[in-house]
A protein has these predicted regions:
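Short, low-complexity, polar/charged sequence segments that are solvent-exposed and flexible
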Residues: 36, 78-81, 133
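Alpha-helical support elements that line or immediately flank enzyme active sites
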Residues: 72-84
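Short C-terminal domain-edge/linker segments immediately following a structured domain
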Residues: 48, 78-80, 90-92
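Structured beta-strand/loop patches that form or line metal/cofactor-binding pockets in enzymes
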Residues: 16-63
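Short, thiol/selenol-centered motifs that function as redox-active sites or metal-ligating centers
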Residues: 64-70
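C-terminal binding/interaction regions
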Residues: 1-22, 83-147
Length: 147
């Protein structure tokens, strides 16, 4: 990887942005959360269902974001099925800390790709959107499952 001196938008970011898995809404999800980045207006909606073991079993997204938000959504969606709500929350929290310069890259496939964005704090919100929405939706789905 080129580190923080690498281009912010590169071929891999653009490829991920163009190939978002699960990029359609679920018909009647257990939970749905929309997150918006106030600076750029990027929006990500995450719909999800949990199985009887409390793991993500179905996922749907609506992504209206910049290439960084789209690429982050792609990485989240490609690896969310089968995850527990705690894993999504841990990934969200680790991503937030890393972008703030307070930790190592998150243990989620591909997120190191955003290293060139570290000095660009105005871009961090759009990178976090999908992870924030997925973690919150998973928690809402769990609450609904328990109720």
């Amino acid at each position: 990887m080129g580190g923080v001196t690498a281009p912010l938008y590169n071929t891999e970011i653009l490829r991920l942005a163009a190939t978002i898995p699960h990029h359609e809404r679920l018909e009647s999800p257990m939970a749905s959360v929309e997150k918006r980045a106030p600076v750029c207006g990027s929006r990500v909606t995450v719909d999800l269902d949990l199985d009887e073991e409390g793991r993500v079993s179905a996922l749907g997204l609506l992504v209206r974001a910049c290439a960084l938000g789209q690429a982050s959504s792609s990485l989240m969606a490609a690896n969310a099925i089968g995850r527990a709500p705690e894993e999504l929350a841990d990934a969200r929290d680790a991503l937030t800390r890393w972008l703030a310069g307070e930790g190592a890259p998150p243990d989620w496939p591909g997120l190191g790709l955003f290293e060139p964005a570290l000095p660009h704090s105005a871009r961090h919100a759009s990178i976090r959107l999908a992870f924030e929405a997925a973690a919150e939706a998973a928690e809402h789905a769990r609450e609904r499952q328990v109720a």
